[in-house]
Amino acid sequence: MMLDTALCLERFAWFIGRHADLSVEALALASDPAYVSVRNRFSATLMESVTCSENGSFVTSWGYRLGSTDDVESAAARLAFLLAAMPA
């Protein structure tokens, strides 16, 4: 069975939205590759784009593996930590 990366990215964006300091700037599901763009609301420079690989890993634009689709909440929390965000 193929991984539905669009659904995984939608779930990732939802968990990002639970962090008060983070904002989902774009959810580009029709792009190749599809991605979520996230930024810290209080910084013009703290931002990151995240893709979902076919093997089920969330990966930043610079190649850092945030976690797997088996635990989307933890992957989103790891990005929140990297972007210096506080939990809601």
Spans of model-derived segments:
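Hydrophobic beta-strand residues in large extracellular and virion-surface proteins
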Residues: 24, 36-38, 50
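Generic N-terminal initiation segments characterized by hydrophobic and/or small/turn-forming residues
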Residues: 6, 43, 76-80
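Short beta-strand micro-motifs enriched in acidic
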Residues: 27-29, 51-53, 83
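Negatively charged, low-complexity tracts enriched in Asp/Glu with abundant Ser/Thr
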Residues: 1-34, 65-66
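Ampiphathic alpha-helical segments that act as solvent-exposed interaction surfaces
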Residues: 64-88
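Intrinsically disordered, low-complexity regulatory segments enriched in Ser/Thr/Pro
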Residues: 43-69
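Short, structured protein-protein interaction patches enriched in aromatics and acidic/basic residues
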Residues: 30-44
